[in-house]
Swiss-Prot record:
<protein>
    <recommendedName>
        <fullName>tRNA (guanine-N(1)-)-methyltransferase</fullName>
        <ecNumber>2.1.1.228</ecNumber>
    </recommendedName>
</protein>
<comment type="subunit">
    <text>Homodimer.</text>
</comment>
<dbReference type="GO" id="GO:0005829">
    <property type="term" value="C:cytosol"/>
</dbReference>
<feature type="binding site">
    <location>
        <begin position="136"/>
        <end position="141"/>
    </location>
    <ligand>
        <name>S-adenosyl-L-methionine</name>
    </ligand>
</feature>
<keyword id="KW-0963">Cytoplasm</keyword>
<dbReference type="InterPro" id="IPR023148">
    <property type="entry name" value="tRNA_m1G_MeTrfase_C_sf"/>
</dbReference>
<keyword id="KW-0949">S-adenosyl-L-methionine</keyword>
<dbReference type="InterPro" id="IPR002649">
    <property type="entry name" value="tRNA_m1G_MeTrfase_TrmD"/>
</dbReference>
<dbReference type="Pfam" id="PF01746">
    <property type="entry name" value="tRNA_m1G_MT"/>
</dbReference>
<dbReference type="GO" id="GO:0002939">
    <property type="term" value="P:tRNA N1-guanine methylation"/>
</dbReference>
<dbReference type="InterPro" id="IPR029028">
    <property type="entry name" value="Alpha/beta_knot_MTases"/>
</dbReference>
<keyword id="KW-0819">tRNA processing</keyword>
<comment type="similarity">
    <text>Belongs to the RNA methyltransferase TrmD family.</text>
</comment>
<feature type="binding site">
    <location>
        <position position="112"/>
    </location>
    <ligand>
        <name>S-adenosyl-L-methionine</name>
    </ligand>
</feature>
<dbReference type="InterPro" id="IPR016009">
    <property type="entry name" value="tRNA_MeTrfase_TRMD/TRM10"/>
</dbReference>
<dbReference type="InterPro" id="IPR029026">
    <property type="entry name" value="tRNA_m1G_MTases_N"/>
</dbReference>
<comment type="function">
    <text>Specifically methylates guanosine-37 in various tRNAs.</text>
</comment>
């Protein structure tokens, strides 16, 4: 996968040389380049922002450097990348979107600052490449750099060969619309607290059922919206019983009791 990131703070992305992302870069699985937006400015002050039309606080990122940057990194006539723009006004970033992005051959990230990027940049870009405005959540950051770090980590770990054990992707939180069950390791007893007996039983069927029930209960307690969004056909009668024990008020309809 090729990834280009444009920012006025390219140093922000130094952590992408570390850990599994660093290995993915070293192996060529992830071809990542970070670019300084000010490269595409032409005045002595390397200006990238100006006051907003209509008044109001803050500054807005000017369209000229962004237009040149996008044309340089995604030349007209070539295979267009998918442009990702982190913004509080974007659609929520989800694990499903991470999987979608992991299937793209080329991603281009535009890191906004101040009050954001002049809207004309995104409208013009949309005429020649897919544009996705994305938000990490209902809060505001100083800029898009932190969001890009999060999105890149979520996407890179889904690329083939990045994780040593691909089975790790199957049972983690959000993989099947649920939060992951609690996890334990050695020792069996720590400060008087024991690992649940079923996990030490060696009975794989019972262990799988316990983890499923715990995942359902944890999701009910912390993210009932995820339970409400589950397709009825993905729940069997034992799942429904677990939801009732967990106190979910209205399990999804359509599953035989």
């Amino acid at each position: 996968m090729r990834v280009d990131v444009v920012s006025i703070f390219p140093e922000y992305f130094a952590p992408l040389d570390l850990s599994l992302i660093g290995r993915a870069r070293a192996s060529g699985t992830l071809q990542l380049a970070v670019h300084d937006l000010r490269t595409w400015t032409h005045d002595v002050h390397r200006t990238v922002d100006d006051t907003p039309y209509g008044g109001g606080p803050g500054m807005v990122m000017r369209p000229e450097p962004w237009g040149e940057a996008l044309e340089a990194l995604a030349p007209p006539g070539g295979n267009p990348p998918r442009l990702l723009v982190p913004t509080p006004a974007g659609a929520p970033f989800t694990q499903a979107l991470a999987h979608e992005l992991a299937a793209e051959p080329h991603l281009l990230f535009a890191c906004g600052r101040y009050e954001g990027i002049d809207q004309r940049v995104l409208e013009h870009a949309a005429s020649r490449m897919p544009v996705t405005e994305v938000s990490l959540g209902d809060y505001v950051l100083f800029g898009g750099e932190v969001a890009v770090l999060v999105i890149l980590e979520a996407v890179t770990r889904l690329l083939p060969g990045v994780l040593g054990n691909v089975g790790s992707l199957d049972d983690e939180s959000h993989a099947h619309g649920l939060l992951e069950a609690p996890m334990y390791t050695k020792p069996a007893v720590w400060r008087g607290q024991e690992v649940p007996t079923v996990l030490r039983s060696g009975d794989h069927g019972k262990i799988a059922r316990w983890r499923r029930d715990e995942a359902l209960a944890r999701t009910v307690a912390r993210r009932p919206d995820m339970i409400a969004a589950l397709p009825p056909e993905c729940l069997d009668p034992r799942d429904r019983a677990a939801l009732e024990r967990a106190g979910f008020p209205d399990p999804p309809e359509g599953v035989a009791k």
